[in-house]
Amino acid sequence: MRYNTELFRKHGITTLVTSCPICLKVFREDYALDGIEVLHHSEYMLRLQQAGRLSLRRGATRFAYHDPCELGRGSGIYDAPRAVIEAVGELLEPEHTRENALCCGSSVANTAITDGQQVRIARSVAGELEATGAEVVVTACPLCKKALGRGTATAVRDLAEVVAERLK
């Protein structure tokens, strides 16, 4: 941690953006990063969009959003990903959402369950997301993307991928 902190300071880093909710929590809670703002990429993309620095094309695509455990319940970030999705298409919510969202079976549980159990959990969660009628499942966590991708034939994208596809 000391090495990373010194590296950030040496290079004058004032904002640190991560796509991983677990990394977000670690940088925010375990590092002494006074003067360095730590953001999840959903927060950063929304900030850029609101400042007029990120122009997106809205389409008719229907997106179902999966709340990552560590991003939502762990860090309280629910609205930023949804606002970004709503800028590019229709947001559909599964039955279990926000603080009641189902775990994809990855993350910390990945060390405590078998691969087969993880896939069964992912299929169950993916089934709920598919039931929304969405064309694309969106999440904001690389572990969730990987897990959900193993549980469905529906396209699964990270929020950043969706944004990249919709840049003006």
Regions found by a protein language model. Name each.
Residues M1-K168:
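Iron-sulfur cluster-binding electron-transfer modules in prokaryotic oxidoreductases
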